[in-house]
Swiss-Prot record:
Known partners and oligomeric status: Component of the small ribosomal subunit. Part of the small subunit (SSU) processome, composed of more than 70 proteins and the RNA chaperone small nucleolar RNA (snoRNA) U3.
GO cellular component: cytoplasm; nucleolus; ribosome; small-subunit processome
Positions bearing the Glycyl lysine isopeptide (Lys-Gly) (interchain with G-Cter in SUMO2) cross-link: 59, 61
Designated name of the protein: Small ribosomal subunit protein uS11
Function comment: Component of the small ribosomal subunit. The ribosome is a large ribonucleoprotein complex responsible for the synthesis of proteins in the cell. Part of the small subunit (SSU) processome, first precursor of the small eukaryotic ribosomal subunit. During the assembly of the SSU processome in the nucleolus, many ribosome biogenesis factors, an RNA chaperone and ribosomal proteins associate with the nascent pre-rRNA and work in concert to generate RNA folding, modifications, rearrangements and cleavage as well as targeted degradation of pre-ribosomal RNA by the RNA exosome.
Encoding gene, per UniProt annotation: RPS14
Family, per entry: Belongs to the universal ribosomal protein uS11 family.
Location in the cell: Cytoplasm; Nucleus, Nucleolus
GO MF annotation list: structural constituent of ribosome
Source lineage: Eukaryota, Metazoa, Chordata, Craniata, Vertebrata
GO terms classed as biological process: ribosomal small subunit biogenesis; translation
Native source organism of the sequence: Sus scrofa
Primary localization: cytoplasm
Modified residues (Phosphoserine): 14
């Protein structure tokens, strides 16, 4: 006899800072725009802990559009 699929509970893992709801978190947004790509990197105030890192290439599929202003806007919105 076939067994039914077992349902697995998904655990949500938060890698960012632990804050209460409605509380603000401050960070530093480092933006590097090269001729080939745009990087948006958010760190804590000391610059040692990364909170988020997004590139234009992560948002665009075509290599020629990685460095476009549209890809940089999508990367900034993802942060």
């Amino acid at each position: 006899p076939r067994k039914g699929k077992e349902k697995k509970e998904e655990q949500v893992i938060s890698l960012g800072p632990q804050v209460a709801e409605g509380e603000n978190v401050f960070g530093v947004c480092h933006i590097f725009a090269s001729p080939n790509d745009t990087f948006v990197h958010v760190t804590d105030l000391s610059g040692x802990e990364s909170i988020c890192r997004v590139t234009g290439g992560m948002k665009m599929k075509a290599d020629r559009x990685e460095x476009s202003p549209y890809x940089a806007m999508l990367a900034a919105q993802a942060v």
